[in-house]
Amino acid sequence: MRILGVNLSNNGSICVLNDGEIELYLEAERLSRKKRDYNCTKLFKYVKNVDKIAISDACWDQHKKKTLISAKNIATLKKKFPNAERYDLRDRHHLTHAACGFYNSEFEEAAVIVVDSSGSNFEEGDECETIFHVKRGRRFHWKVLHKRYNTEDDIGIGFQFDMVSEKCKWGREEAGKVMGLAPYGFYQPSSGLGYLQSSNENAAA
C-alpha cells in the first residue's frame, strides 16, 4: 500500500510510504529556495500512484493568502489522484503533533503532551494544550485525557514563545527555534522578557 502524507503548513512537505517504508520525502523550500515555503503543488509531480492521502495543515483562517494556496494544493491532489482515498486531518492539529512525536519514539504506549497555541478550532475555542493517551497496534489508538482552549485573556504557552521569538527579532515562525534553545537557558529578570510572566498573572487575576 502506498500512502502520501501532505503537510500544507509553513514547512510544506510530502512523504510517500510504501508498505510502511519511506520511499520519498521532499520539502517545498528545498526546491523553491524560499524558507518555510508552504506551497506543495510543485512536489506532486514526483509522486506516482498512491492508494491513500493524508492531509495535514495549520490553521490559516487569519492568513487568506495561505488559505487560498492550501485550497490550490488540495485541488491539485484531487485532480492528480482522483481514485485515492483521502483523510483530511486539518481539524486534528494537536493529534497529528502527538502522532508524529509518538511514532518517532520507541514507546509502545505513552502519554503525550502537546503545547501549541495554534491548534484546531473547536466550539470551545482554539486548541491550546492537549494531553493524549496513545498506543501502538494495527491502528493508532488514542484518547484525549485533557484539553485546554485559548481564551481572550489567556494566550497559552505557544504564543508566549512567539512573543519571545519576535523579541529576539527572529519572527514568529521561528518560535520552534526558541523552544529548542529554551532548555539550555535560565531565567534572567533583567532580560526584558519579564512581561510574559506579568501578563499571565494579570490574566489569571
Predicted regions and their residues:
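Short acidic/glycine-rich loops and adjacent helix/strand connectors
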Residues: 1-205
